[in-house]
Design a protein with these regions (language model features):
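Membrane-embedded transmembrane alpha-helical bundles that form the catalytic cores
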Residues: 1-499
Length: 500
């Protein structure tokens, strides 16, 4: 069930909100039970058989947590639980990749049936691994099965995050004031509308200039440099508006029930370094990789060479977390390399005592280099095949696709738009859309800043002119965002991070 579907918007969500409000009148506990039940139904609506997997995962990890109350047994049970979670994740997500790799190296064809990847398995598995690791570190064991179930399964974040921490979620479920603020609900609805607009109006339309081109290259075709750059930049913006739009929608939905989720995006394309980019992009994943992988590996405490090795290993595994394939490994490896170079640069500046703030020219150059590096890495993230990624890179830099004619395909073609305006004019239309989307990403405040959410409750003065207030004007803007999104929902494109 997609957030951007009529079934969700006009059936599931109203029914859940009304049932929650009615249950809350009885007791806070009843409201939490309703949310837990609704969340399980939400997941089961996709494929009921995998609801059993989710329930089994929750029951297993909750029971392991209870068993870890005994300090003597805690390390062994915790290690077993982490290994078991990883084994389940590896079976569903990496079996095909492992067997394909073995077959390629050995030359022996291995026949196996495709395994359907359960939605959100990377997210709910990592959250529960973090829970077990925290108990091993001395955190309190959760004894309430309903609160634990909702921590894992709360439908706004269940499928594609944000990755949440038990310590920031479970206490909220137990507070009696949860869900009682009308202003909080109004802010949540407006944030949801903004996220839906980013997904349906921006991301899905940008996809029409990216997906057909990448598919064409994956199939062995070629494209001229102009179309290669248009598709790559369109995807760069598509994945940002798609995933940040989902995160905004999740935050907004949670606020309808008085629950606060963590911020997941902080205008990442405004970053002037790769280090800063990862403090702004998929913030909750960066937090997980730092706290449960990079720091346990030694972080930067064991010398510079070990720090760079830890960075590379962390980002390689971060790439594999996104998907089972060499393209994701290369994407993660590139970002590990970028981060290492960035830290080397900082170390060199420090050794030269160049500690003054960079000037405008240096910041502009740093921003351009950072964005260029991120864009190139996205090629591997998006391409379905290594050959397709290679052809895209060749086309971007003029080594491939010279003299190649490309006829646009996809939804735009089915709408006869290329026939009406011609391929060259269509290229200009796509360029205009990309330019507009970049302007939004680079020069406007992000949704959390506009709505004063979380750490942006005291937004800088320069954003005061667009700051959200519970008034008629913002009610109108919310209605316009919702209505324009509803008209665009006929495409029914899934969120990109559903595949992870």
């Amino acid at each position: 069930m997609l957030f951007s579907s009529y079934t969700f918007l006009f059936q599931f969500l109203p029914a859940t909100v009304l049932a929650f409000l009615a249950a809350r009148r009885h007791s806070p506990r009843a409201g939490i039970l309703v949310l837990a039940g609704a969340s399980l139904f939400f997941y089961g609506a996709w494929q009921p058989i995998y609801l059993l997997l989710l329930i089994a995962s929750v029951a297993m990890n909750f029971s392991l947590g209870l068993g870890m109350e005994d300090p003597l047994r805690r390390p062994a049970i915790g290690a077993f639980g982490v290994a078991l979670n990883l084994a389940v994740l590896c079976y569903f997500k990496y079996t095909g990749f492992i067997l394909d790799t073995v077959s390629m190296v050995s030359g022996i064809p291995l026949i196996f049936s495709d395994i359907v990847l359960p939605l959100g398995i990377s997210f709910f598995t990592f959250q529960q691994i973090a829970y077990l690791v925290d108990i091993m570190r001395g955190a309190k064991v959760e004894r309430d099965i309903v609160s634990y179930t909702l921590f894992v399964c709360f439908f706004p974040h269940l499928i594609a995050g944000p990755l949440v921490h038990h310590a920031e979620m479970i206490p909220q479920f137990k507070r009696s004031r949860t869900g009682r603020s009308a202003v909080l609900a109004a802010r949540g609805l407006a944030i949801f509308a903004a996220g839906l607009f980013k997904k349906v109006v921006l991301a899905d339309n940008l996809a029409q200039f990216a997906s057909p081109v990448f598919a064409h290259l994956d199939a062995g075709g070629g494209v001229p440099t102009s179309w290669a750059w248009l598709a790559t930049l369109a995807y760069t913006l598509q994945i940002y508006f798609d995933f940040s739009g989902y995160s905004d929608m999740a935050i907004g939905l949670a606020l309808l029930f008085g629950i606060r989720l963590p911020v997941n995006f902080r205008s990442p394309y405004q970053a002037v370094s790769i280090i800063e980019f990862w403090r702004r992009w998929h913030v909750t994943l960066s937090r997980f990789l730092r706290d449960y992988l990079y720091i346990p590996l030694g972080g930067n405490r064991l010398g510079k060479q070990r720090r760079y090795a830890n960075l590379m290993l962390t980002m390689l595994l971060g790439g594999l977390w996104h998907g089972a394939g060499w393209n994701f490994l290369i994407w993660g490896g590139l970002h590990g390399l970028y981060l290492s170079i960035n830290h080397l640069w900082h170390d060199w500046r420090s050794s030269q005592k160049r500690l003054s703030a960079p000037g405008l020219t240096e910041k502009g150059l740093s921003w351009a280099i950072t964005l260029f590096a991120v864009v190139i890495a996205w090629v591997f993230f998006r391409a379905k095949t290594m050959a397709g990624a290679g052809k895209m890179l060749g086309s971007l830099f003029g080594f491939d696709g010279v003299g190649v004619a490309y006829e646009p395909t996809g939804v735009l073609w089915m709408m006869d738009l290329p026939i009406l305006v011609g391929p060259e004019r269509l290229l200009l239309i796509g360029g205009g859309m990309v330019a507009l989307a970049f302007a939004i990403a680079l020069f406007l405040p992000n949704v959390s800043q506009i709505f004063g959410y979380h750490e942006y409750r005291r937004a800088p003065e320069q954003y005061a002119f667009v700051r959200w207030h519970p008034n008629a004007a913002w009610a109108l803007f919310t209605a316009l965002a919702l209505s324009s999104s509803l008209f665009g929902m006929w495409q029914r494109l899934e969120f990109l991070y559903f595949q992870f």
